[in-house]
């Protein structure tokens, strides 16, 4: 019914503007009907093309999002790996420094104890010699008393 209203409106407009009476069976109205049909078909085809384009754009945007997410994950993983390596190196360097400090302390204490150990060894040797002499003297005293 809407198409009939449009045709009636068109007939009135032609009569008002151009002063010509046009009937429903006039060839000019056939052209108008064909033109309206072509425009409807064109609009439908354009809508289908727009829908396909929209779908393709959404697909591309989704792929870009996935790509960006993948790149972000790879970047984060690389940063984490680099951080882990740096922490490991730092811990190794700290352990080496601590071991070196302990070694130097042990060497310093050992160097300080060398002289007292020598002195203790000398005193022990003298005690052993004195003990040996006491045993020999006791042995001589025992032999002399027999």
Curated annotation (Swiss-Prot):
Any Pfam family hit: Activator-TraM
A GO biological-process term: quorum sensing
InterPro entries xrefs: TraM
Transmembrane regions: none
Domain of life: Bacteria
Keywords: Conjugation, Plasmid
Protein family per UniProt: To plasmid IncP-alpha RP4 TraM.
Protein name, UniProt field: Protein TraM
Native species: Escherichia coli
């Amino acid at each position: 019914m809407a198409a009939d209203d449009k045709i009636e409106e068109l007939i009135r407009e032609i009569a008002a503007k151009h002063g010509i009476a046009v009937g429903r069976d006039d060839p000019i109205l056939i052209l108008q009907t064909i033109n309206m049909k072509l425009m409807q078909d064109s609009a439908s085809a354009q809508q289908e093309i727009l829908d396909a384009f929209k779908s393709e754009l959404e697909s591309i945007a989704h792929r870009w999002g996935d790509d960006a997410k993948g790149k972000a994950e790879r970047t984060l993983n690389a940063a984490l790996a680099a951080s882990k390596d740096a922490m490991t190196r730092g811990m190794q360097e700290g352990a080496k420094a601590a071991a070196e400090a302990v070694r130097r302390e042990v060497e310093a204490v050992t160097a300080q104890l060398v002289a007292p150990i020598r002195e203790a060894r000398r005193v022990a040797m003298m005690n052993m010699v004195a003990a040996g002499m006491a045993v020999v003297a006791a042995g001589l005293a025992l032999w002399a008393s027999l």
